[in-house]
């Protein structure tokens, strides 16, 4: 049994070698010749999986180690009788922590408290729900917009997108990309929406590039609209609008979900799905794969305030480390993908062990995802 895996899927070679012969290949582009005798293909979001790639090939199963699936033609796979699995929620925590790192940086730079801001969350799936929970743990007001979930009657106080635009100081997008249909998200943030945002609002896109109309956004920024912008995703990736990058406050190369934990979850989820598909079901404990955290333990004295939270968050991950490299190489062919391929190891907040002498600080840090314990001062 021959299994092709994206060369940038961590732990993929070791895990999938339990099931067959593994060959690691680049994800963009997939070497077509390698598909001629392969039984399974494991990809990331950079690989377009459709009829033109797989027609006439012996592939029986496709796995994507990503939460999003808009790079996969699922309808054609089903029609062709090819098994498929994604990894929903695998990088949700990573994206939430990216958003927090960005907001805490902007709050420090511009001198505001997040408690004074209302956050509108567009898309309340794996990422949106976790983001809501962590924001509300801090006492920050959230507004939720998710028309598909609202129409299904899912639990939640869902508002219209117009309401979020009117009332939110921060608008953050966490939707799939739907190019048409009743829940179309292509250019959901169009010129009209962008112009309607509150003065000084913060716009964040960490889902799919085309959810925000990049041309319209650049037009508004060029005209002097007072707006802070965080973009991790771009229309036309791996190409991007260099002029837009110059205008945004934070710009990164589609790495919001790139924690070691998130990547490992994605790999293990598709590994488990494929093992079940071939009748050799196996399960993997994530902590058996991950290396020891870079930091040992941190001692925190007193209650948790915003500056202290910012220091803890940026100790684990400061978004500026990914902004600067993109600006240096933007517009150079191949460099966007190179930044992603050679991405520095990044951990999640749970990798930081915090000893608190304040019980409320320990409790709050645990709710936020840190590995915190309370030890009273002696």
Swiss-Prot record:
Provide a GO biological process annotation. pyridoxine biosynthetic process
Predominant place of localization: cytoplasm
Pathway named in the protein's UniProt entry: Cofactor biosynthesis; pyridoxine 5'-phosphate biosynthesis; pyridoxine 5'-phosphate from D-erythrose 4-phosphate: step 2/5
Q: Where in the cell is it found?
A: Cytoplasm
Q: Which UniProt keywords apply?
A: Cytoplasm, NAD, Oxidoreductase, Pyridoxine biosynthesis
**Superkingdom of origin:** Bacteria
What Gene Ontology cellular component terms go with this record? Answer: cytosol
Q: What does this protein do?
A: Catalyzes the oxidation of erythronate-4-phosphate to 3-hydroxy-2-oxo-4-phosphonooxybutanoate.
- Any idea what this protein is called? Erythronate-4-phosphate dehydrogenase
List the source organism: Escherichia coli O6:K15:H31 (strain 536 / UPEC)
